[in-house]
């Protein structure tokens, strides 16, 4: 199963990987355009299909005092400018039923947040908006249980669903990635494209802190392993100065390393997908 996102950008587990790349949260128009411009330059140079990602509201911050974003109205204006300036599709997350319709007027892909993927009303509203859907797998859910979320989307007429791994809870305050789950997600849902969110899989929490920590020094290790499985896309956040990012900086790739990082991802993806299919039973 392949999911067409925009002209020239289609996600499928046997196709060249799509980069869902950007920033964690919108900070300003100028900052967003600067970062997106770097992504566009690198992905076009390397020939990687690209979808820009960012959140207009981080509704699940650990602290009530943490920065949440620019809000829905300003966020949609920024996304519209990104599309007009660079001609790239956009993905963003929807947290409330009422947001689905206005977000769908601008965004090319609507995302179901991991913590909300069991909320039927939200899933149905996002699916009914008629755009491709990216479902973040909750940290507490097994890969095979995502079939129920896909079924909810299908029941209201939307079969353009992608599934995104972002790590599983491993005890308290830690995440691990089960690479075996990638194929399980695809096989139990009729071949839905599988996306790997390497950035958020690197999160780790300080039990006494008020924000998530991260392990960005290991992003290359985890991304190489995920791409080597043979998946539809990579979900990545980068920042010009991760230590000063407004959210999830400890897990973000330094933006100046984007080209070197993606060059390796493309080399691995090209190699794996040139190999003949070999079913082992």
Swiss-Prot record:
Its EC number is 2.5.1.55. Keywords: Cytoplasm, Lipopolysaccharide biosynthesis, Transferase. GO terms for cellular component: cytoplasm. Pathway: Carbohydrate biosynthesis; 3-deoxy-D-manno-octulosonate biosynthesis; 3-deoxy-D-manno-octulosonate from D-ribulose 5-phosphate: step 2/3; Bacterial outer membrane biogenesis; lipopolysaccharide biosynthesis. InterPro entries: Aldolase_TIM, DAHP1/KDSA, KDO8P_synthase. HAMAP family: KDO8P_synth. PANTHER family: PHOSPHO-2-DEHYDRO-3-DEOXYHEPTONATE ALDOLASE. This is 2-dehydro-3-deoxyphosphooctonate aldolase 2. It comes from Burkholderia pseudomallei (strain K96243).
């Amino acid at each position: 199963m392949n999911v067409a996102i925009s002209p020239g950008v289609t996600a499928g587990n046997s196709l060249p990987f799509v980069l869902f790349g950007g920033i964690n949260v919108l900070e300003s128009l100028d900052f967003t355009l600067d970062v997106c411009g770097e992504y566009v330059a690198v992905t076009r140079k390397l020939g990687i299909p690209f979808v820009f990602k960012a959140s207009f509201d981080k509704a699940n911050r650990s602290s009530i005092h943490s920065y949440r974003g620019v809000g829905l109205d300003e966020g949609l204006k920024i996304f519209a400018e990104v599309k007009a300036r660079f001609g790239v599709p956009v993905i963003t997350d929807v947290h409330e039923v009422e947001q689905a319709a206005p977000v769908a007027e601008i965004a090319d892909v609507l995302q179901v947040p991991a913590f909300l993927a069991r909320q039927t009303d939200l899933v149905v509203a996002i699916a009914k908006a008629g755009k491709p859907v990216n479902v973040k797998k909750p940290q507490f859910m097994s890969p095979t249980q995502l079939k129920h979320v896909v079924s909810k989307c299908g029941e209201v007429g939307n079969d353009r669903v992608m599934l995104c791994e972002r790590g599983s809870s491993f005890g308290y305050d830690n995440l691990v990635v089960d690479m075996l789950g990638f194929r399980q997600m695809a096989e139990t849902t009729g071949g839905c494209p599988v996306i790997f969110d390497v950035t958020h899989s690197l999160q780790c929490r300080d039990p006494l802190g008020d924000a998530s920590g991260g392990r960005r020094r290991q992003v290359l290790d985890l991304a190489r392993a995920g791409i080597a499985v043979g998946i539809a896309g990579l979900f990545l956040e980068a920042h010009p100065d991760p230590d000063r990012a407004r959210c999830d900086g400890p897990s973000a790739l330094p933006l100046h390393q984007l080209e070197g990082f993606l060059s390796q991802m493309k080399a691995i993806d090209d190699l794996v997908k040139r190999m003949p299919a070999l079913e082992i039973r």
